Amino acid sequence: MLENKNFKFIENEIKNNKVVLFMKGIKKSPACGFSGTVVAILNKLGVEFRDINVLFDAELREDLKKFSDWPTFPQLYINGELVGGCDIARELYQSGELEKMLKAYTR
């Protein structure tokens, strides 16, 4: 099997950053409402996170879907694990679970 450069990039990012958001746009200027919602949640919680814009690299978008087995964006990773997209992040935030997860892994 050939080595996938995007898989290596993804693995490196989620290994070296406690919180990573693969999103449409950037945290200062989200390009879709779903990405904007997750950025707003993370900002409300005061979390530093690595944002990676997937809009301009179709190959990265497709490889990320394969890597995560998750078909949509944004994709939120905490401590190397996929948490999910906008709906899951919102539900976890509203229940208080997201804050607990972030405190456990970002201290």
Swiss-Prot record:
Residues 7-107 form the Glutaredoxin domain. The keyword RNA-binding does not apply. One of its GO terms (molecular function) is disulfide oxidoreductase activity. [2Fe-2S] cluster binds at residue 32. The keyword Translocase does not apply. CDD domains: GRX_PICOT_like. Pfam families: Glutaredoxin (PF00462). Glutathione binds at residues 24, 61, 73, 86-87. Keywords: 2Fe-2S, Iron, Iron-sulfur, Metal-binding, Redox-active center. Belongs to the glutaredoxin family. Monothiol subfamily. This is Probable monothiol glutaredoxin 2. It comes from Rickettsia conorii (strain ATCC VR-613 / Malish 7).
